Design a protein with these regions (language model features):
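Catalytic-domain carbohydrate-binding cleft regions of carbohydrate-active enzymes
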Residues: 1-328, 334
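Aromatic, loop-rich ligand-recognition surfaces of beta-strand-rich domains
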Residues: 580, 636-698, 707-752
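Cellulosome-associated attachment modules in secreted, modular CAZymes
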Residues: 746-864, 871, 887
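Beta-strand-rich modules
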Residues: 575-594
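Pro/Thr/Ser/Gly-rich low-complexity, intrinsically disordered linker/stalk tracts
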Residues: 520-551, 580, 598-610
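Accessory, solvent-exposed terminal regions and/or long lumenal/extracellular loops of proteins
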Residues: 335-440, 456-458, 462-521
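Low-complexity, serine/threonine/proline/glycine-rich extracellular segments that form mucin-like
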Residues: 864-890
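Surface-exposed beta-strand/loop patches in extracellular or lumenal glycoproteins
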Residues: 284-301, 409-431, 885-889
């Protein structure tokens, strides 16, 4: 809390961890720990922060549990003042009832023992009904990579479509990190989501918003402050989501058409009725500072305004090459929007209850109903809340009338007397401004400056170029950067009873006509020449049309699938997520301020992808020598090179063992022999599979013709395995050879990499961190089942040294380099000996790589009394290649 305050960062709540060996108190009793928690909660509330718990323990006391991990949710709520609960792995449970009953119990306790407090629960997982008491967080994921942002966008959209509007995820992941560009982009788009959650202590770097220094600290602070300003809008659409549309809305919910009803808009969403958010989720044309562009932004019918620059976009098109410098999230406001706001704050205690702010983009006739209540109790369920209807109308003479109707309703702490501030987006100074409350006209004075405006009431000010960069770190280079938005008319009215009469603002001579952003050049345009999809630009799921540049063109447009892709700056454009082996047609034209050229038609067909479910990264080993390093060529997805056993040496019978590196549901494998079916073509043998390379199950036999045709072996009942063994008994010329072996998993199934405990598809330090934190967790512990149990590689029901060793020995900076040096040394030794000696050396090396030795445990006494210390001595005898030891009490 002190750290966030020192860096002027918003912070709403803090969740100490009650488990994973941490606990929230370090005393010898549960009551002592509750008192410890209360002292933290008291300090937090003095600083405007609420306290919750990140829990993986039971809710109620159990005598057999140590004080460190004891729980008493009643005392935590009643005595310590806990108001937030984040549940974890242990809360998923078996079936529906476990988790649902748990959050129901907590919700009722929070209300009953917490002075009618409103339950705030965030759960790892859930089912139908979870939304009644809990929101959802997406679980332990790895940040620092663009994939983290990419997959979360449709995840959030899908949550809303599933009836769960309250969705969040760890900022930049709980694991990983060390990529400030991804970090900033994650903070940006999640400004327009219900909640943001920092999970620190598990990643490659601290997960604070200021972890990377400048300019990232300044940008993250800007977006967190913006989120605080948008709280009245967010709260209003949150209340709507109780019985209406979710806060994060799939495009088709508001704009259903053939384009939005598919996957085409899965990387953008509506935040309430007025904001359209298109997160930066990949590098498109980024420079080293992270300045980039965003393709594929579909703006529906109507007019849309860049929230930061004020540029105006006509809807019904798909915009590309949209500027996205590092500081800028592509976010658009629908023309006509009415956005209730608050003063920027670091927590809700800093929000001015005597001020209401409305930002407007007047266009036609629009309305929005704001909602507010006490924010902390269950009284809203009985109707204790306040609604305010705001209407905006632009007439045929460009006069704007904004009517804020009397607030309706009441709640404890509601301040009826409020000042009202309007922010009207314009492009030139209006000719007249007036206001009245009920029948009473307000005498408005024009302020001389923004500072003058802030210090007075019943005043207006034309802000010609608002500097949006208001929260940069003092003295930083980013503070010097002026980021100008479109002009605004600012109006502030003195405090009045907002329930008594309507407040009406009238603006004469309203104009919002931004300068054209894209159409800048003039001159005749010719149809693009040489438009085509070349062979190298066609793939199974993508096509990239290219064309020659056209003189006088500002940008290009492509018509595809009944949609217009516009503002394409270059002479190529990539279409993704297409169907394999499917013909497609495009039309390309050039555009400038004078219009557009004639169309040029392009047709192309996507290629086939027969290897979609072929497993990559396979490594092989044979029981006989091979010609050089050719065995690697059997699994490199290149059919032009060949594997061959050692020339002039009989190979059969021999074994070929394939390490898939991942555990898969096996469907089949393809053996691609030499094109002529010549020497080494495999003809007869048997196939086995295994999880551990020690216990093998026979899958069947093969008998293949001696020709160059692809040979197919199918697995019955889709067994699960990591290893496949071919025992070859007959081959052409008694050798072994082949161009490729493709092993296919069952279509649509996932591969699991042993040791990848955080399930991000790779072994890295994030996995090691998790293993260390979960060391000693065993079957029967509440949070063992699930992805933690997947980390039990040797399947002994315990996260132990064996499991940790599997990961630690694969880390590049600690294991690979010494092994590379050892391999180099082995190669040098091989050069100095003959073939026979090499074989003997290889056999000896195999013996040496086996872990061996004995552990002897002895106690210092034969008998012990209560309270005695037990000393156990451990000695190793003839230990070989041991890099870790596990000890645990039964």
């Amino acid at each position: 809390m002190d750290r966030y305050k020192a860096h002027d960062m918003p912070l709403g709540w803090l969740l100490p961890n009650d488990g994973y060996g941490a606990g929230y108190g370090q005393t010898d009793t549960l009551d002592g720990n509750i008192a410890n928690l209360k002292s933290l909660a008291d300090y937090a509330r003095k600083n405007g922060v609420e306290i919750g718990l990140w829990t993986q323990s039971d809710l109620h006391p159990k005598p057999e549990i140590s004080a460190l991990l004891q729980r008493d949710i009643v005392k935590e709520v009643r005595d310590a003042g806990v108001r937030v609960l984040k549940t974890d792995v242990a809360w998923v449970g078996a079936g529906y009832s476990f988790g649902l009953n748990g959050i129901t119990d907590v919700a009722q306790i929070m209300t009953y023992y917490g002075n009618n407090s409103r339950p705030f629960i965030i759960s790892l997982d859930g089912w139908a009904g979870t939304q009644r008491y809990a929101g959802i967080w997406s679980g332990d994921q790895t940040g620092g990579v663009w994939e983290y942002i990419r997959f979360h966008i449709p995840t959030y959209i899908g949550s809303g479509l599933s009836g769960q509007p309250n969705i969040c995820s760890d900022m930049d992941g709980i694991f990983g990190g060390k990529n400030p560009l991804v970090n900033v982009r994650d903070f940006q788009w999640k400004t327009f989501t219900p909640m943001e959650l920092n999970m620190d202590g598990w990643g490659a770097n601290e997960k604070y918003p200021h972890a990377f220094g400048e300019p990232y600290t300044s940008i993250n602070r800007w977006y967190l402050k913006l989120k605080s300003e948008l709280l009245p809008y967010a709260y209003s659409i949150a209340e709507e989501s109780v019985s209406g549309l979710p806060m994060i809305r799939a495009m088709f919910l508001e704009y259903p058409n053939p384009y939005t009803l598919g996957k085409a808009t899965q990387y953008q969403f509506l935040y309430g009725p007025y904001f359209l958010v298109a997160p930066v989720y990949q590098e498109t044309r980024a420079d080293k500072e992270g300045n980039d562009v965003r393709h594929g932004i579909y703006l529906p019918e109507g007019q849309w305004i860049d929230y930061f620059t004020g540029d105006l976009y006509e809807g019904g098109k798909i915009y590309n090459d949209v500027d996205a410098p590092l500081w800028k999230l592509p976010v658009f406001v629908k023309n006509g929007a009415i956005i209730p706001m608050a003063n920027p704050s670091n927590n809700v205690s800093e929000i001015n209850p005597n001020l209401r702010i409305y930002e407007l983009y007047p266009h036609g006739s629009t309305s929005f109903t704001t909602y507010d209540d006490d924010g902390v109790t269950e009284e809203y369920r009985t109707g204790r809340g306040v609604r305010t209807l705001v209407e905006s109308r632009v007439d045929g003479k460009n006069n704007v009338t904004v009517t804020v109707h009397p607030a309706v309703g009441d709640f404890a702490g509601f301040q009826k007397k409020k000042a009202t501030e309007f922010r009207i987006n314009v492009t030139q100074k209006p000719s007249g401004v007036s206001a009245k409350i009920g029948e009473n006209s307000i005498n408005l004075a024009e302020a001389n400056s923004l500072e003058d405006f802030k210090s007075r009431e019943n005043v207006y000010f034309y802000d010609r170029a608002p500097n949006l960069n208001r929260f940069a770190t003092k003295g930083s280079d980013f503070e010097k950067k002026v980021i100008a938005g479109n002009p605004q008319l600012l109006v502030k009215l003195a405090a009045a009873d907002i329930t008594a009469a309507p407040t009406v603002l009238s603006v004469e001579g309203f104009r919002f006509e931004p300068a054209e952003k894209y159409r800048l050049s003039s001159g005749a345009l010719t149809a693009p020449a040489n438009a085509a999809v070349t062979e190298e630009n066609a793939a199974a799921y993508t096509l990239k049309p290219t064309w020659d540049a056209v003189p006088n063109a500002d940008f290009y447009e492509i018509e595809f699938g009944g949609m217009l892709y516009t503002t394409i700056k270059g002479t190529e454009f990539l279409f993704e997520d297409l169907e394999a082996e499917t013909p497609y047609s495009f039309k390309v034209r050039a555009a400038n301020r004078d219009g557009h050229s004639a169309w040029t038609a392009v047709s192309a067909k996507t290629k086939a992808n027969p290897l979609e479910f072929a497993i990559p990264g396979i490594e092989g080993e044979t029981s006989v020598e091979n010609q050089g390093s050719s065995l690697a060529k059997l699994f490199d997805f290149k059919e032009k090179d060949v594997w061959h056993t050692k020339h002039d040496a009989k190979a059969v019978p021999f074994d070929l063992v394939m390490d898939l590196k991942t555990i898969n549901w096996l469907e089949k494998f393809h053996y691609v022999p030499r094109e002529d079916g010549g020497n080494g073509t495999l003809l007869k043998g048997a196939v086995y599979y295994s999880m551990d390379r020690e216990n093998w199950t026979k899958a069947g036999t093969f008998q293949w013709d001696k020709n160059g045709d692809v040979k197919i072996f199918g697995f019955k009942d889709a067994p699960t395995a990591r290893y496949i063994k071919l025992h070859v008994t007959e081959s052409a010329g008694d050798y072994g050879s082949g161009r490729e072996i493709y092993v296919f998993k069952v279509p649509g199934t996932e591969s699991y990499l042993p040791g990848d405990i955080n399930n991000d598809g790779k072994i890295d330090r994030n996995d090691l961190t998790s293993y260390i934190n979960y060391t000693g967790l065993r079957k029967g512990d509440s949070d063992f089942e699930g992805y933690i149990s997947n980390g039990d590689i040797n399947k002994n029901g315990l996260i132990d040294a064996y499991d940790i060793s599997v990961v630690a020995t694969q880390l590049e900076d600690e294991a690979d380099q010494p092994q590379e040096e050892a391999d180099k040394k082995d190669e040098e030794e091989d050069k100095a000996v003959g073939d026979d000696e090499k074989k003997k050396a290889a056999e000896e090396a195999k013996k040496k790589v086996r872990v061996d030795g004995t552990l002897l445990l002895s106690a210092d006494k034969k008998r012990y009394s209560r309270g005695d210390a037990v000393k156990v001595s451990v000695k190793g005898r003839n230990l070989r290649l041991v890099n870790a030891l596990s000890f645990a009490l039964p």
